[in-house]
Amino acid sequence: MSGGKYVDSEGHLYTVPIREQGNIYKPNNKAMADEVSEKQQVYDAHTKEIDLVNRDPKHLNDDVVKIDFEDVIAEPEGTHSFDGIWKASFTTFTVTKYWFYRLLSALFGIPMALIWGIYFAILSFLHIWAVVPCIKSFLIEIQCISRVYSIYVHTFCDPLFEAIGKVFSNIRINMQKEI
């Protein structure tokens, strides 16, 4: 096998293994890959360019983690500390939060990324190789039960409820208001 390329929905070209002789679906696979590689820039399928400026492009943490000094500490009208104390408190809160977050992320960021990467890999693995096959198996197995249940309902319940419906269909109620 040799390295080849394919184009995703966004138009990025990725490297994938290509068979030298092609296959029944793409007999000229190698030649087609060479034509495509001349036209576009190649991206690796397992790497993604990350944005170092906008680190929350999907806005996951907008309403949870975005805590500023004004969200935590507030002095009501008529109860104010000295202006210097207020400014120093603001600076202390902001700088402490900023640098302590950086310290925690430096110490625990990579281990937590490793743990969460392993967790989501296990979760993906279980979903792909256990959950979906179990659900498909259950749906296949439940079809025979649903057919038996359907026959039971049509054989026993439908005639019973039709008979009850015919018995009660002739009941008439007349409401009269007496003056």
Curated annotation (Swiss-Prot):
Modified sites of kind Phosphotyrosine: Y6, Y14, Y25
Keywords recorded for this protein, A-Z: Acetylation, Cell membrane, Golgi apparatus, Isopeptide bond, Lipoprotein, Membrane, Palmitate, Phosphoprotein, Ubl conjugation
Q: Which GO terms describe its biological process?
A: angiogenesis; angiotensin-activated signaling pathway; apoptotic signaling pathway; basement membrane organization; calcium ion transport; canonical Wnt signaling pathway; caveola assembly; caveolin-mediated endocytosis
Q: Where is this region: Required for homooligomerization?
A: 2-95
Q: Where are the N6-acetyllysine residues found in this chain?
A: K5
Q: How is it modified after translation?
A: Phosphorylated at Tyr-14 by ABL1 in response to oxidative stress. Ubiquitinated. Undergo monoubiquitination and multi- and/or polyubiquitination. Monoubiquitination of N-terminal lysines promotes integration in a ternary complex with UBXN6 and VCP which promotes oligomeric CAV1 targeting to lysosomes for degradation. Ubiquitinated by ZNRF1; leading to degradation and modulation of the TLR4-mediated immune response.
Q: Which residues lie within the membrane without crossing it?
A: 106-126
Q: Tell me which GO cellular component terms the UniProt record holds.
A: acrosomal membrane; caveola; caveolar macromolecular signaling complex; cell cortex; cilium; endoplasmic reticulum; endosome; focal adhesion
| Chain residue ranges for the region called Interacts with SPRY1, SPRY2, and SPRY4 | 150-161
Q: Cross-link named Glycyl lysine isopeptide (Lys-Gly) (interchain with G-Cter in ubiquitin), where?
A: K5, K26, K30, K39, K48, K58
* Mode of membrane association: Peripheral membrane protein
Q: One GO molecular function term?
A: protein kinase binding
Q: Which residues are annotated with the PTM N-acetylserine? A: S2
- Phosphoserine modification sites? S2, S9, S37
Could you tell me which Pfam families the record lists for this protein?
Answer: Caveolin
Positions where lipid (S-palmitoyl cysteine) attaches? C134, C144, C157
Cytoplasmic-facing ranges: 2-105, 127-179
Which stretches of sequence are listed as region Interacts with SPRY1, SPRY2, SPRY3 and SPRY4? Answer: 132-143, 168-179
Q: Where in the cell is it found?
A: Golgi apparatus membrane; Cell membrane; Membrane, Caveola; Membrane raft
Q: Which residues form a coiled coil?
A: none
Recorded family membership: Belongs to the caveolin family.
Function (record text): May act as a scaffolding protein within caveolar membranes. Forms a stable heterooligomeric complex with CAV2 that targets to lipid rafts and drives caveolae formation. Mediates the recruitment of CAVIN proteins (CAVIN1/2/3/4) to the caveolae. Interacts directly with G-protein alpha subunits and can functionally regulate their activity. Involved in the costimulatory signal essential for T-cell receptor (TCR)-mediated T-cell activation. Its binding to DPP4 induces T-cell proliferation and NF-kappa-B activation in a T-cell receptor/CD3-dependent manner.
User: What quaternary structure, including any partners, is listed in this protein's UniProt entry?
Assistant: Homooligomer. Interacts with GLIPR2. Interacts with NOSTRIN. Interacts with SNAP25 and STX1A. Interacts (via the N-terminus) with DPP4; the interaction is direct. Interacts with CTNNB1, CDH1 and JUP. Interacts with PACSIN2; this interaction induces membrane tubulation. Interacts with SLC7A9. Interacts with BMX and BTK. Interacts with TGFBR1. Interacts with CAVIN3 (via leucine-zipper domain) in a cholesterol-sensitive manner. Interacts with CAVIN1. Interacts with EHD2 in a cholesterol-dependent manner.
Fetch the PANTHER family from UniProt: CAVEOLIN, CAVEOLIN-1
**Protein name according to UniProt:** Caveolin-1
Task: State the organism of origin.
Answer: Microcebus murinus
